[in-house]
Amino acid sequence: MGYMPYYYFNQNSSFGSEAELRSLITKFKAAGIGAIADVVINHRNTEGWYTFPAETYKGVTYQMQSTDICKNDDGGTTATQAATDGVSLSQNNDEGTDFGGCRDIDHKSENVQKVIKAYLKYLKDDLGYTGFRYDMVKGFDGSHVADYNDATGVEYSVGEYWDGNDKIESWINRTNKKSAAFDFQFRYNVRDAVNGAANGKVATSSDWSKLNSNDNLMHDANYRRYAVTFVENHDTQYRSADSQNDPLKRDTLAANAYLLAMPGTPCIFQPHWRDYKPELKEMIAARKYAGITNMSNYANKKCQKTLYVNEVTGTKHKLLVAVGNDADKYAGETGYTKILSGYHYAYFLSNDAETSWTDVPSGSYEEGFKTTLTAVSQTEGAKLVYTLDGSTPTAKSTTVESGKEISINGTCTLKVGLLVNGEVRNIATHQYTIEKFNAYKFMIYVNADAVKWSPLYCYTWKKAASVEWPGEKMTETKTIGGKTWYYKEVSIDNATELVNVIFNNGSGTGKPQTVDITGLTSTAYFEIETSKEGKKYKVKDVTAEYNK
């Protein structure tokens, strides 16, 4: 696994064990969530130039050969080496973009197809994945994705074809429209609107009229069902001063508000979810309530530099999404009621929804808060009734005008109903838990016996880098299980924090380092291995062996 995969059927990695992965997928399924596997099959790592691992699964041994490597791999460098070594490559050239540093594999090869189909069936039928995210599909013909999807019977797939809109549409066609694709141009539309300028530049103010673009999959009724829309991902996010990439420079919530109101299949960036979970949950709830799908139609209502408004028609109701510096001044359209608002965004639900709306979602919170109750109704003057003890509200329960705030001071079950002409309708239930987060500390242990790095450094970060490379020199050790373990104490200071770490041999060109180890929240044990993923050393997570 990983971006330069060597093994297909071994799912133990620096992220955790195969057993932990299976447990996670099972828990997702129980919650009605399908897991999508990141499938990297354009290229594959080798031992030396040509040797792929032999892997036995269910009594069958699968192994790619040197003749499965594209003839012109690495711009012909591999062929030159093969001629020197007397090794044969495939007679077929690469079907797409060449990837340097790994062997580009020939998807026309029957052996390659056999191995990959077995691998994908293992992911779906054995591990339990629901779908696939095909990485770097510019490297091989889209017809193979159709073949692989047919062979595995996978429920869903999306391809990463990072290019212009016409080429993405052509790739979708090559898959016989059996796969979705990431809508990169949608992302660039949003970036340019937020930044106020194109190509990653930043103007003094945003220009939300730049959202009015036909250069995306989402605008086209024939392709929007295949569009996986997003506003940020791992390749565009800011990582460090040395790896700034192409992030949104402001208005993250407004960008997501637009994303979640529009057709296509929206994909939320995980760091955004962690940072803005309550707000994003409410946006998702509004999308679902209106019945907005990947095929919904929309019409523009306002297209100005400081205000952009679309009306989106769902299968149940309509939703107005307003974004821009003047979104707070926008009063909506006749027949709509504002249900959500924040910095530079607002949602309005059509009054035929006939429902109450609460602008703070169910969940756990560290302290009490206020939530606004809104009556969405075609009846003027409709009010709301509510209870905080889980009982069903009646016309005699506590009554409030639409748009009023109520206080949630402790754990409770809030039930809210729409009160129209003395009748209580469409009662909604919200579960709130108020529990203060207690900061805590935990240990990160590492064993470097296999690589014998001296000195050994530990570079840690949370949301952003807070220390300079190479981090803190590790000097303290413990003997556990007959092995010497270096260790470092770290802290979690709030409920959304994660700790990330890289072990390394110090600063300087050519100094070795491990792969990134991300998302730690509790004591963990890692062994640095001699094998590499690209130029970085792999680590083995052995936490389960020691945290007993």
Q: What is each PLM-predicted segment?
A:
Residues 3-4, 9, 25, 33, ...:
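Active-site-proximal helices and loops of the catalytic beta/alpha 8
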Residues 49-114, 177-196, 227-233, 238, ...:
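Glycan-binding loop/region signatures in secreted carbohydrate-active enzymes
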